[in-house]
């Protein structure tokens, strides 16, 4: 009888381990696959795709759009009549916040990375692609300020201004499965999702502590 109890315990433990193992593989925890290139021993992560199913590429222009009904694209705005606009907002389906969004480019420290594919959970810098004055030319890179607000004024190469992209399980009303969330991933700190919040009457992009709280985004080639 004792041996039967031990066997039952081992079978139950194995079953629970398999369940936990299976749950660990989802779009939130993408499987790292080996490269198909025989001369490349590096491991690669899945590609990030735009709304039309094309891989995102470093240096190309995109609109970051929230596909949910009533939501809209991300844009640069000037709050408080500053010399350089620095607020990162989200358009909404209400008159004062209607719009088409401001194009962005994803960049890395090395200019030689231009044209490379963007992969999930790899660090990138996000930069608005806008006409600007000499005074504001270095004020287009995203960062997160001390209030947890996404603003511009970051620097390419500053490890505290790194963002990453993660796949979600969401599907757009049109049926696209290429829906992602953004994360702010400063050096030596845990990544935080990018969510949304009204602050002083404006729909701001903010960091959030709850892993289940985030804004969904699709990327539209501009």
From Swiss-Prot:
It comes from the Eukaryota. Residues 1-26 form the signal peptide. It is found in: Vacuole. Residues 27-42 form a propeptide. The keyword Transmembrane helix does not apply. Pfam families: Kunitz_legume. Tuber. GO terms for molecular function: cysteine-type endopeptidase inhibitor activity. Disulfide bonds join 84-136, 185-191. GO terms for cellular component: vacuole. A motif (Vacuolar targeting signal) lies at residues 29-34. InterPro entries: Kunitz_inhibitor_STI-like_sf, Prot_inh_Kunz-lg. Gene3D superfamilies: 2.80.10.50. The keyword Signal applies. Keywords: Disulfide bond, Protease inhibitor, Signal, Thiol protease inhibitor, Vacuole. Putative inhibitor of cysteine proteases. Does not inhibit papain. May protect the plant by inhibiting proteases of invading organisms. Belongs to the protease inhibitor I3 (leguminous Kunitz-type inhibitor) family. This is Cysteine protease inhibitor 9. It comes from Solanum tuberosum.
